[in-house]
Amino acid sequence: ALLLGAMKEVQPYLVITVPLVMEKIFKSKVAPIVNKPVMKVLCAIPGLNQVIFKKVRNTLLNAFGGKVREIVMGGAALNPDVEKWFRRFKLPFTVGYGMTEAAPLMAYEDWWEFASKSCGKAIDTVEVRIDSEDPYNKVGEIQARGMNIMSGYYKNEEATKAAFTEDGWMRTGDLGLLDEKGNIFIKGRS
């Protein structure tokens, strides 16, 4: 309640948050509406469902002050059911990927091109690879290199050596896959 009160006052254009915040807002503001039996029926009627989805989308955006152009989430995976509903509402959201050692962003995609269940594509200053024989089908460690990837840990050669492959790619410790378009799909931790 405190966060949404501040959002109404500040009226941000961009919201950067963790998925848990959006999931809690969904569960408190939207789920009670769309999970009613009558709403489930109405949401299944073509045409009428778009009117309902637009109203719900506006309710969500107004909860953030009414001026939000994009919601960027990161730090964890977004609940697939919540993502499904956000897509139905045409909510302008995306999920990015990064870590402190990457200052902090490594992957992102504009909300209108964002691939479901991904965390976007490597940003312009970063290359990402999957340490796998088949990075499109077999999970492997996500590795990165580029301008904003750290060069090492301050005064800690041992940790720096462990953080990089012999050919200079930073080990993220995250497991994932790529698709043909370069979208990254996180599957866990190594």
Describe each region flagged by the PLM.
Residues 4, 57-60, 161:
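Short hydrophobic/charged patches on amphipathic alpha-helices used for structural packing
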Residues 19:
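Short secondary-structure boundary segments
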Residues 77-88, 105-110, 119-124, 134-138, ...:
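Active-site glycine/GP-rich loop and adjacent strand/helix microenvironment
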Residues 117-122, 164-167:
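Short Gly/Pro-enriched turn/cap motifs at secondary-structure boundaries
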Residues 129, 136-190:
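Conserved ATP-binding/catalytic segment of the ANL
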